[in-house]
């Protein structure tokens, strides 16, 4: 019966019903909301309107008869209905009498909805009625009735249908399940972990998937399921679907199901109990709720509670009410089993951080929306007619973006809704234009609101205002007060709002309204923001933000504006322009400005560095704008590597990313780590040609994900690296990859690490290797493969030509490959040629096989050996960690000679025993390529290292022919193959010695054994003695290590005999306490037994370091008898011999015996006693050694514990050195010491530093000094000598005419040194620093200076000598004749005026001949000539006639003129002449005028005003005898320069003129040229840094012929180009005396260089030519190379920084063979390369002094060649190879270079191993002053070597080790080296890995260690 028949048959009844309800509109509205909570009603339009009531009754009637009858029943009971009308109403539509029996009868239908029937029954809350005690049967009956009521209520709510997707009614069969994916460990019991749930092709079977949601195994705890999905995925729909299924009886495991929404529960104002939540707020039992609740508790395992929208739950701190968060509290108690224990709880939520109330063991299910099949299934169900279905499906299949949007079920519904409107009247494919974005999709939906195309602008904006207000306040549920009736009607008409009843507390109900979907609320809010004139642009752009999903991990509740920025971006699209203009009723400019503002914000965001989630949201926004320029900008702003970590990504997210990548040109790397990924999302990457590296790492990636990925991989043409690690891929997923990977031939790396692959899948993947020609790595580690496939893997590695390495270790399985282009050889057609080619390929290919910890046994070894024999050359075989044991190791070792192993065979950790060791040794007898065998049973180490085949070695050396000529004979001999055997920690005893030696003899029958290591065994003294007897049978070794074998002293004496009995033993090192014993051959260091062995170029390190034998015995206690026996044993040793002894202490008797035995050791060259405590008498015993043994040339005893004696075979050599620093010597020891030393023939050096002499000891020493035949340095530093001692020395100075220099400093350095000369009368220099003198002491000083006639120079530095004291000193010093120079450095010099200084100098008793003042440096120099000669009055008057005496200093002038009359040299530096009155300049003018003998005047680095310069110029104009003038580096203006040039016109006798850094303009240059034309005697002209340029050079060149005597010409830094150079070249032949020519730092190219090259041969005297820092290039260099041999006198040339390459460099150095005098070569900062270096090494001039090649692109080979060539240059003083990549090519010197002062190897990437040889051989350079090793990779090993040699480097002043890898240990060693006697003032160590506190501690112990950059810069 339909509504139409009702109206026809009961027209009067229907009309009366309308009239009745018109009078009760509020009652009708309440009932409609109760019966129709989810439907939208016309309640906003005049509720009393009969038409509205009529329409509402029709909707109610359409719900079915059960609902309609329930409504009529409530109408009759609750309203005042007349009896005459009630009877027909009840008779037609009323309930039957048996309604009360339906529940018991079990019928499924129920009249009325679930919550609101029975309004006649008064409300009674749970707990308000008295509880009655019921029997078990009654309780069961009551529960049964309630459960049936609960089910029928659910059926009634759904009205027989299940809610489907939004906007469209659906039947139960039309529901399309989304893709579900399990997470965590709680997978369904009957489903595969990681599988997706739900089959879109079989809707009937979907119940099985839904059932799986509740079939997982819960461990002792609550059964909680969390369903996670982004907005629009269908979480709420699935929740109601579950309730519908349960109501239909399809979830039979649950008796009761309760469904709650958190958005409604948030409205509860009073904290409910669980029974109140279930009964009062959901459905109340008809009676006895206590019994029903008790039943539910007892059967909790069959109760399901669903809570929808956990992300919307309010926390206790979210609102201000006391009961806030009460619903979440109940939810938490349920989840943790505190309430209704055992029940099932399910909740839905958007992704993010779950509240703490969710148990960690809860099952998590991800909802991913629709895949392609589900989209098509949904479209098919949506459209009822076949034509519409076909059209819609066609649109979906042709529009990938539309299909991608439909992956979100909510958007799929909107899309279908829009297509239903568009398809009938549109052409195919039009959806791509009309629905390109989500925003456009929603706009199409909005346009359907008004079919007449007239938009309801006011309603839309009003709706948007409500939506925005809700977003701003966090409101999704609105009340009647929030929405106006008009808007409510608008929302109801267009299905935009949904209404429902809300229980805020028991017994209280309200009506709530909400948007049908939160995204719709965001869309209307975006419309309002873009179109409302009440929102300005600043407010608008504040909403364009990116919501980071990382925030979701820290916030308990999501924000409500996830899609708002995307909608705003979409509305900023040009396609929305007209719509917004119409909606806002504004012009295009107004709308355009707002759209542009949004685009600008997105552009700024695109330029920033964003987190992964924000980047994804930005890509969505950019896609919505449809702005190609913004998309391109965003794409180009991406980093080269995009990483996304730990947040969910959907197909839509990757589609947005792919859309951006389409606009990118450069390749990109994509890395997805720990991100939950939608199974079909890789399909979005189809065609992404910009992706070069793609990596996925997530446990949620399974087979379905792999299948989807395989559809994309073949379309990604640039993909080189693919990673699918940490996933759950099984055989099913691998089957797709196996089919796909061959289609990706460009792949270089594939990683399937940590999946679930088994043997068949692994083998299938490995078999793909030949089909991937560019693959370099395949990683299959951490999968489920077994040991049974190991041989198959090895076979593949051997047979596949591209495999170069197979690594298997426990769970690791990695293939490394070489691309085909690198390994394939050319093939020819003939079969025999093919065979040769394949042989060559097998020989060239090398393979590494690492099969570690694979449980291999001897039978496996047999199979492997068989496979190995078929393989190409094996580079490495590693079988460590297996179970081969003795027989297996022997088997593999015996086969080693046939396996062609190039490098290493590792059999470690295989259970080898001592017996097995002998097996392996004997097996090695047939292996000719064995280089090293290392066996350690304790460490389970068995490693065999092999050398290359001889033919390969020869081939590898072909390219190094130039270097071979430099290899010394010793080195060539050592470069042959060397065999090393190390048997350490093997437990060998003395009884094993013979057996061991027998095995060793067997192993070296055909190949000599070079290095033998038997350390860390238990041979003992007996075993070692026996071994020394058997050593001759092992042949000539190069080293033997017997450390840690428990040796005795007898064994040591036995080993000492080896120095004489075994010819190969050159060095014996013994440390008894630490039990270290080394026997070494010639040229072998202790490193010989290290695992790494040098080959190739590095073999040069084995060059002969020592030519003498050495014996080192440490940590022992030597008694007289032992010493006697030891010396007797050493007598038989051939020499030369070096002996080093280290004892805890050595008695005087023992020392005497040792010294007495020295004459019997004529071969002894060095004796050291290190760390040996000696007595206080030992200095006298050692001082007497020169008389006892004349061969001793040097004795040093430091701190009574370090003694060194040097011997020389030439006893006739004059001069010996003796030193006793730190030996506590005092005045009482001086006489005895001098008596012993007086027996020397000649004493060249005596070091008594750091003793206790004091002033008295100095007196004693000076008294004994005449006895000493000293002719060198006497060092008394650090002896606490004071000023009194200095004065005493000066008093006695006339008694020592052979003292040449005295240097004293009373600062913390405490320097006191005297230098004696062999000849008398050479003059004495006295240097005093920080020696403060009192006035009385100044008088004594002056008296001594007057008496010491031999004193010629006095230095006073910081001696606190003030101006009065200086005046007194100058006045008191008076001599009968001679010269005395005084150098003064005091702080007050810069603060005293020039007249004051002049006045002081005028007080001198002698005549002033030289004067030099530097104010900034605070230095004063003057030279006095005695006696003071008085001039006659006539000459005095003549000199005064030119002077300006009209000054206040006129009284001084007469005295100055007299004092300065004989002044010959005047130098003023850093002096200011800016005084206003010109006093200083006038005074200087008068001095110049009066100094008729002045020959040299220098004024440099000074401030000179124009007025002062006028005075100076006037004075200079009268200096007619001036020969030298230096006016460089002054601050002058152009007019000042002209004034100065004018003063030069009369200086025709000048020989030297320096005018650097002057502003030489055209006029001043013209004056200079005019002056130069008169200086015919000029020899030295410097005009550098003047910017003369080409024009000025042309003018200058014109007068050069007038300077025939010119010898030195400097034009550097003058911007001279090729034109100026050509002018110079034309004139230079007219300067025949030119010797030094400097054109550096100009702009000369190859053209100018060609001109120079043409005339340089015409300069026969040219000795130095500097053309550095120009641009001559290779062409110019070749021109110079052709003419350089024509310059016979050339000594120095500098071509640094000239862009010279190998072509020019090689040609240049080839010309060096013609030079006889060349001393200096500087070619740095050019790209010379190795060819130039090797060529230069063959042609270095033997007289070379300086070689500078920094930053020249040199390599190791060139550096080694140069080092060997430098050994043939005995005069070399400086070598610089800095900033070259030398690595292992550090210069290795083996010959003495006596003059070498500086070595610069900074920033050369040098490591310890390469630098140790250089450090150890620094003693070959006795004159070395600077060692620069900064910026390398040096560590503690080099520091240790340096510490050893520092005490022997007497001239070393600078050691730079900053920016290295030296630790605190290395610094401590360096400190010890300094303490032992090094004179190095500082070692720079900053920027090394040393902690600040450790550095401070070390620096406090040894101040010469510098760890501070600041301190360093001040040095």
UniProtKB/Swiss-Prot annotation:
Interacts with CHUK and IKBKB; prevents CHUK and IKBKB phosphorylation and inhibits their kinase activity. Interacts with RIGI and IFIH1; blocks the interaction of MAVS to RIGI. LRR repeats lie at residues 622-646, 716-740, 744-771, 772-796, 871-898, 900-923, 930-953, 1006-1033, 1034-1055, 1138-1161, 1162-1184, 1240-1263, 1265-1292, 1348-1371, 1481-1504, 1519-1542, 1552-1575, 1576-1598, 1603-1626, 1631-1654, 1659-1682, 1687-1711, 1715-1738, 1741-1768, 1769-1795, 1821-1845, 1849-1872. ATP binds at residues 229-236. Residues 223-542 form the NACHT domain. It comes from the Eukaryota. Induction: By interferon gamma. By LPS and viruses (at protein level). Expressed in spleen, thymus and lung. It is found in: Cytoplasm. Gene3D superfamilies: 1.10.533.20, P-loop containing nucleotide triphosphate hydrolases, Ribonuclease Inhibitor. Pfam families: Atypical_Card, LRR_6, NACHT, NLRC4_HD2. Keywords: ATP-binding, Cytoplasm, Immunity, Innate immunity, Leucine-rich repeat, Nucleotide-binding, Repeat. GO terms for cellular component: centrosome; cytosol; nucleus. Belongs to the NLRP family. It comes from Mus musculus. Residues 103-137 are annotated as: Disordered. Probable regulator of the NF-kappa-B and type I interferon signaling pathways. May also regulate the type II interferon signaling pathway. Plays a role in homeostatic control of innate immunity and in antiviral defense mechanisms. SMART domains: LRR_CC, LRR_RI, LRR_TYP. This is Protein NLRC5. One of its GO terms (biological process) is positive regulation of MHC class I biosynthetic process. GO terms for molecular function: ATP binding; RNA polymerase II cis-regulatory region sequence-specific DNA binding.
């Amino acid at each position: 019966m339909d509504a139409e028949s009702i109206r026809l048959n009961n027209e009067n009844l229907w009309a009366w019903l309308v009239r009745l309800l018109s009078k009760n509109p509020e009652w009708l509205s309440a009932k409609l909301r109760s019966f129709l909570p989810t439907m939208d009603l016309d309640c906003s339009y005049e509720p009393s309107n009969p038409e509205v009531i009529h329409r509402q009754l029709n909707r109610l009637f359409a719900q079915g008869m059960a609902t309609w009858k329930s409504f009529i029943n409530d109408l009759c009971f609750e309203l005042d209905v007349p009896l005459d009308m009630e009877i027909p109403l009840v008779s037609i539509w009323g309930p039957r009498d048996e309604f009360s029996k339906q529940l018991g009868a079990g019928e499924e239908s129920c009249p009325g909805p679930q919550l609101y029937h029975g309004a006649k029954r008064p409300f009674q809350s749970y707990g308000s009625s008295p509880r009655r005690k019921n029997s078990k049967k009654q309780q069961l009956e009551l529960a049964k009735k309630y459960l049936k009521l609960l089910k029928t209520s659910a059926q009634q709510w759904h009205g027989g249908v299940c809610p489907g997707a939004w906007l469209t009614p659906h039947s139960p069969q039309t529901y399309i399940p989304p893709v579900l994916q399990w997470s965590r460990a709680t997978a369904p019991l009957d489903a595969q972990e990681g599988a997706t749930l739900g089959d879109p092709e079989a809707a009937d079977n979907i119940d099985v998937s839904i059932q799986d949601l509740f079939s997982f195994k819960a461990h002792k705890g609550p059964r909680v399921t969390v369903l996670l999905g982004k907005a629009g995925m269908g979480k709420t729909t699935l929740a109601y679907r579950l309730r519908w299924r349960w109501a239909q009886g399809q979830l039979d495991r649950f008796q009761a199901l309760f469904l709650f929404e958190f958005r409604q529960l948030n409205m509860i104002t009073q904290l409910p109990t669980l029974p109140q939540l279930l009964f009062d707020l959901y459905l109340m039992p008809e009676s006895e709720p206590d019994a029903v609740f008790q039943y539910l508790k007892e059967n909790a395992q069959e109760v399901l509670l669903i809570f929808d929208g956990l992300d919307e739950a309010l926390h206790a701190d979210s609102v201000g009410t006391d009961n806030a968060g009460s619903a979440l509290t109940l939810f938490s108690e349920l989840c943790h089993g505190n309430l209704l224990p055992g029940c099932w709880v399910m909740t839905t939520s958007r992704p993010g951080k779950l509240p703490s109330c969710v148990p960690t063991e809860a099952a998590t299910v991800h909802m991913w929306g629709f895949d392609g099949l589900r989209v098509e299934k949904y479209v098919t169900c949506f459209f009822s007619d076949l034509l519409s279905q076909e059209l819609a499906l066609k649109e979906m299949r042709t529009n990938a973006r539309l299909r991608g949007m439909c992956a979100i079920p909510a958007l799929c519904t909107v899309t279908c809704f829009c297509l239903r409107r568009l398809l009938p009247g549109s052409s195919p494919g039009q959806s791509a234009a009309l629905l390109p974005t989500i925003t456009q999709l929603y706009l199409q939906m909005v346009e359907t609101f008004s079919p007449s195309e007239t938009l309801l602008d006011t309603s839309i904006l009003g709706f948007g205002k409500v939506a925005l207000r809700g977003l701003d306040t966090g409101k999704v549920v609105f009340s009647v007060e929030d929405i106006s009736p008009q808007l409510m009607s608008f929302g109801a008409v267009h299905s935009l709002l949904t209404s429902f009843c809300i229980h805020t507390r028991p017994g209280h109900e309200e009506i709530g309204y909400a948007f049908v979907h939160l995204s719709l609320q965001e869309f209307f809010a975006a419309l309002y923001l873009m179109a409302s004139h009440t929102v300005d642009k600043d407010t608008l752009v504040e909403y364009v933000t990116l919501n980071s999903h990382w925030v979701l991990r820290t916030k308990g509740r999501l924000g409500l504006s996830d899609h708002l920025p995307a909608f705003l971006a979409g509305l900023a699209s040009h396609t929305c322009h007209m719509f917004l203009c119409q909606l806002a009723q504004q012009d295009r400019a107004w709308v355009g400005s707002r759209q542009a503002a949004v685009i600008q914000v997105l552009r700024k965001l695109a330029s920033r560095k964003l987190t992964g989630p924000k980047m994804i949201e930005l890509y969505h926004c950019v896609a919505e704008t449809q702005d190609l320029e913004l998309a391109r900008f965003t794409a180009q702003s991406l980093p080269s590597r995009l990483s996304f970590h730990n947040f969910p990504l959907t197909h839509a997210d990757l589609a947005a990313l792919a859309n951006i990548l389409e606009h990118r040109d450069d390749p990109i790397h994509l890395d997805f780590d720990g991100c939950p990924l939608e199974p079909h999302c890789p399909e979005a990457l189809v065609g992404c040609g910009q992706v070069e590296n793609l990596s996925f790492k997530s446990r949620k990636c399974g087979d379905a994900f792999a299948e989807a990925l395989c559809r994309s991989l073949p379309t990604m043409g640039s993909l080189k690296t693919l990673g699918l690690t940490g996933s759950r891929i099984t055989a099913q997923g691998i089957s797709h990859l196996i089919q796909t990977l061959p289609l990706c031939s460009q792949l270089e790396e594939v990683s399937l690490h940590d999946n679930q692959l088994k043997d068949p899948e692994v083998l299938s993947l490995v078999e793909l290797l030949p089909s991937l020609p560019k693959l370099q790595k395949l990683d299959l580690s951490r999968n489920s493969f077994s040991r049974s496939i190991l041989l198959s893997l090895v076979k593949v590695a051997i047979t596949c030509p591209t495999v170069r390495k197979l690594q298997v270790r426990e769970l690791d399985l990695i293939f490394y490959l070489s691309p085909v282009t690198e390994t394939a050889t050319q093939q020819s057609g003939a079969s025999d040629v093919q065979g040769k080619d394949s042989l060559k390929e097998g020989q060239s290919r090398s393979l590494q096989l690492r099969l570690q910890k694979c449980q291999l046994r001897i039978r496996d070894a047999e199979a492997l050996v068989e496979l190995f024999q078929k393989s190409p050359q094996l580079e490495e075989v590693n079988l460590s960690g297996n179970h081969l044991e003795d027989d297996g190791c022997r088997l593999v070792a015996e086969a080693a000679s046939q396996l062609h192993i190039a490098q290493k065979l590792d059999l470690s950790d295989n259970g080898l025993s001592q017996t097995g060791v002998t097996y392996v040794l004997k097996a090695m007898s047939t292996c000719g390529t064995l280089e090293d065998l290392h066996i350690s049973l304790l460490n389970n180490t068995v490693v065999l290292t092999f050398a290359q085949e001889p033919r390969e070695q020869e081939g590898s050396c072909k390219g190094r022919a130039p270097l071979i000529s430099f290899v010394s004979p010793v080195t060539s001999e050592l470069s042959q193959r060397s065999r090393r055997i190390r048997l350490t920690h093997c437990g060998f005893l003395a009884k094993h010695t013979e057996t061991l030696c027998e095995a060793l003899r067997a192993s070296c029958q055909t190949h000599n054994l070079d290095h033998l290591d038997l350390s860390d065994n238990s041979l003992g003294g007996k075993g070692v003695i026996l071994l020394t007897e058997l050593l001759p049978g092992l042949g000539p070794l190069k080293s033997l290590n017997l450390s840690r074998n428990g040796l005795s002293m007898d064994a040591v004496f036995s080993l000492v005999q080896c120095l004489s009995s075994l010819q190969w033993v050159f060095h014996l090192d013994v440390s008894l306490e630490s039990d270290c014993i080394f026997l070494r051959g010639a040229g072998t260091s202790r490193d010989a037994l290290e695992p790494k062995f040098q080959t190739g170029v590095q073999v040069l390190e084995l060059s002969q370091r020592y030519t003498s034998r050495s014996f080192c015995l440490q940590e022992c206690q030597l008694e007289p008898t032992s010493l006697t026996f030891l010396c007797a044993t050493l007598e038989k040793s051939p020499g030369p011999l070096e002996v080093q002894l280290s004892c805890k202490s050595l008695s005087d008797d023992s020392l005497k015996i040792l010294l007495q035995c020295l004459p019997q050791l004529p071969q002894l060259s060095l004796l050291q006693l290190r760390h040996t405590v000696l007595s206080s008498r030992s200095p006298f015993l050692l001082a007497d050694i020169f008389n006892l043994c004349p061969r001793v040339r040097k004795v040093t005893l430091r701190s009574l514990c370090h003694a060194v004696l040097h011997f020389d075979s030439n006893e006739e050599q004059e001069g010996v050195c003796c030193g006793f620093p730190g030996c506590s010597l005092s005045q009482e020891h001086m006489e005895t010491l001098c008596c012993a030393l007086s027996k020397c023939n000649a004493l060249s050096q005596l070091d008594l530093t750091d003793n206790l002499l004091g002033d008295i000891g100095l007196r004693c020493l000076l008294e004994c000094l005449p006895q000493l035949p000293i002719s060198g340095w006497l060092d008394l530093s650090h002896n606490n000598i004071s000023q009194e001692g200095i004065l005493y020395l000066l008093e006695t100075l006339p008694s020592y005419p052979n003292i040449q220099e005295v240097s004293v400093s009373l600062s913390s350095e405490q320097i006191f040194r005297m230098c004696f000369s062999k000849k008398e009368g050479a003059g004495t220099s006295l240097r005093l620093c920080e020696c403060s003198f009192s006035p009385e002491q100044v008088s004594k000083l002056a008296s001594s200076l007057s008496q010491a006639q031999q004193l010629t120079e006095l230095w006073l530095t910081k001696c606190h000598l003030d101006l009065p004291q200086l005046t007194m000193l100058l006045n008191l010093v008076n001599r009968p004749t001679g010269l005395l120079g005084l150098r003064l450095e005091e702080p007050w010099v810069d603060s005293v005026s020039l007249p004051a200084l002049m006045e002081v100098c005028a007080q001198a008793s002698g005549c002033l001949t030289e004067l030099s003042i530097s104010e900034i440096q605070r230095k004063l120099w003057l030279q006095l000539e005695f006696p003071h000669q008085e001039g006659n009055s006539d000459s005095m008057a003549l000199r005064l006639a030119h002077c300006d005496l009209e000054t206040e200093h006129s009284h001084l002038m007469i005295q100055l003129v007299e004092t300065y009359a004989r002044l010959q040299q005047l130098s003023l530096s850093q002096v200011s002449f800016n005084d206003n009155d010109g006093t200083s300049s006038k005074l200087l003018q008068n001095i110049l005028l009066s100094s008729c003998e002045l020959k040299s005047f220098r004024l440099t680095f000074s401030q000179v005003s124009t007025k002062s310069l006028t005075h100076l110029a006037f004075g200079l104009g009268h200096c007619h005898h001036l020969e030298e003038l230096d006016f460089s580096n002054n601050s002058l203006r152009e007019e000042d320069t002209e004034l100065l040039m004018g003063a030069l016109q009369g200086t025709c006798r000048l020989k030297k003129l320096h005018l650097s850094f002057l502003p030489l303009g055209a006029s001043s240059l013209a004056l200079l040229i005019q002056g130069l034309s008169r200086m015919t005697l000029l020899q030295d002209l410097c005009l550098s840094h003047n910017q003369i340029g080409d024009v000025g050079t042309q003018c200058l060149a014109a007068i050069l012929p007038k300077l025939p005597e010119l010898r030195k010409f400097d034009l550097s830094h003058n911007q001279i180009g090729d034109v100026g150079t050509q002018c110079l070249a034309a004139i230079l032949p007219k300067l025949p005396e030119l010797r030094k020519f400097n054109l550096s730092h100009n702009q000369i190219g190859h053209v100018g260089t060609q001109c120079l090259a043409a005339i340089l041969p015409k300069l026969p005297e040219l000795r130095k030519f500097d053309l550095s820092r120009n641009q001559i290039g290779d062409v110019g260099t070749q021109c110079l190379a052709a003419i350089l041999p024509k310059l016979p006198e050339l000594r120095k040339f500098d071509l640094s920084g000239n862009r010279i390459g190998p072509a020019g460099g090689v040609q240049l150095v080839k010309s060096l063979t013609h030079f006889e005098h060349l001393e200096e070569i500087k070619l740095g900062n050019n790209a010379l390369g190795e060819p130039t270096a090797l060529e230069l090494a063959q042609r270095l001039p033997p007289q070379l002094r300086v070689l500078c090649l920094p930053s020249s692109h040199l390599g190791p080979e060139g550096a080694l060649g140069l080092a060997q060539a430098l050994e043939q240059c005995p005069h070399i003083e400086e070598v610089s190879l800095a900033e070259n990549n030398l690595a292992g090519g550090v210069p290795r010197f083996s010959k003495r270079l006596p003059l070498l002062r500086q070595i610069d190897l900074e920033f050369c990437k040098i490591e310890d191993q390469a630098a140790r040889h250089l450090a150890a051989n620094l003693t070959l350079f006795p004159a070395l002053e600077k060692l620069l090793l900064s910026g390398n990779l040096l560590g503690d090993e080099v520091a240790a070597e340096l510490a050893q040699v520092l005490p022997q480097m007497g001239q070393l002043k600078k050691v730079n080790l900053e920016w290295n890898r030296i630790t605190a240990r290395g610094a401590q060693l360096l400190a010890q080296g300094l303490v032992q006697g090094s004179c190095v003032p500082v070692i720079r160590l900053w920027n090394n890995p040393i902690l600040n506190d450790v550095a401070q501690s070390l620096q406090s112990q040894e101040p010469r260690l510098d760890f501070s950059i600041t301190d360093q810069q001040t040095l």
